[in-house]
């Protein structure tokens, strides 16, 4: 039985992970959980899965959580130290790192330093500090399993093959809700329009990232570190059906792809159970029901955020951390109705233009770059003329 910790258990990845755990009580046991503000859901999860320890992002929420858990024996903690305690709880064999944003960096690093394998769903870990985390992974001899459907697909497609035989990694993207929207109409996109993803059910932030294709840009940067591939070997194809989750091209001209019904439980289960496979409840793919699989190159005029991610990867050093921070500020501002959809990319670009990339030698320096990026993006956001679209 594999004993796991789930950081970010109240988010969409965390909830899906617990569904896998509940379906396989003979294979997985939850030793610790962490959540942010959804205390009611966290309390229900604690009652159902009975972890030894649970952490909340804000220690001030501990008294309220205690009230919700009357009669339940569980150690409660909070803050960064609490998240690290959840990640390194005695007996934990795998950490599911699903905290959204830079808040996931320190506890994920703590797990790696403790020699614990990580199922990685937190994009920011590799986007902002890829070189540092891969050095930690190598130094502490732990395994890093991708949870993103695209990176899981690549991981499965390179099994048994030599890295030097790979000529290209091809990430697929649905294109989101605005794949065919006339460019002139993007100015009037509403929040609800952007949250209406055609294929995937995800959290609000990642759904907006999917609409702008920043999500795919972050995945390009992740792939660079996960698979030790230079930017020129990583490309993106628009694939509206979201059936092929990613592909790998080899020197002999062959392309290996992973196909499946769009459901995050499949890559989560593979990360948890590797090298075995377990049932997930995901509907099997029936190829005879498909009308076709189509592909196209992304239009960077329509999706400027993808181009900004490639730019950040090319400049390297601190630029990806600053870009990521600016994106989080921009998405939050859009969801609050303070800027328009098109101003998301504009805000990120202005923040990047104001930054001089420099080397990051520690996680604290990464967090400092993140803080600089957020502060600068907020200042720039205040100067933008609002395009409020509710």
UniProtKB/Swiss-Prot annotation:
Keywords: Isoprene biosynthesis, Manganese, Metal-binding, NADP, Oxidoreductase
Gene3D superfamilies listed in its UniProt record: 1.10.1740.10, NAD(P)-binding Rossmann-like Domain
Gene Ontology terms: biological process: isopentenyl diphosphate biosynthetic process, methylerythritol 4-phosphate pathway involved in terpenoid biosynthetic process
Listed GO MF terms: 1-deoxy-D-xylulose-5-phosphate reductoisomerase activity; manganese ion binding; NADPH binding
A Pfam short name: DXPR_C
Protein residues bound to 1-deoxy-D-xylulose 5-phosphate: 123, 149-150, 174, 197, 210, 215-216, 219
Domain of life: Bacteria
EC number: 1.1.1.267
Top-rank EC class of the record's enzyme: oxidoreductase
Binding site for NADPH: 10-13, 36-38, 122, 124, 203
Required co-factors: Mg(2+); Mn(2+)
Residues that coordinate or bind Mn(2+): 148, 150, 219
PANTHER family hit by this protein: 1-DEOXY-D-XYLULOSE 5-PHOSPHATE REDUCTOISOMERASE, 1-DEOXY-D-XYLULOSE 5-PHOSPHATE REDUCTOISOMERASE, CHLOROPLASTIC
UniProt record similarity statement: Belongs to the DXR family.
Function according to Swiss-Prot or TrEMBL: Catalyzes the NADPH-dependent rearrangement and reduction of 1-deoxy-D-xylulose-5-phosphate (DXP) to 2-C-methyl-D-erythritol 4-phosphate (MEP).
HAMAP family found in the cross-reference section: DXP_reductoisom (MF_00183)
Name listed for the protein in its UniProt record: 1-deoxy-D-xylulose 5-phosphate reductoisomerase
Higher taxonomy: Bacteria, Pseudomonadati, Thermodesulfobacteriota, Desulfuromonadia, Geobacterales
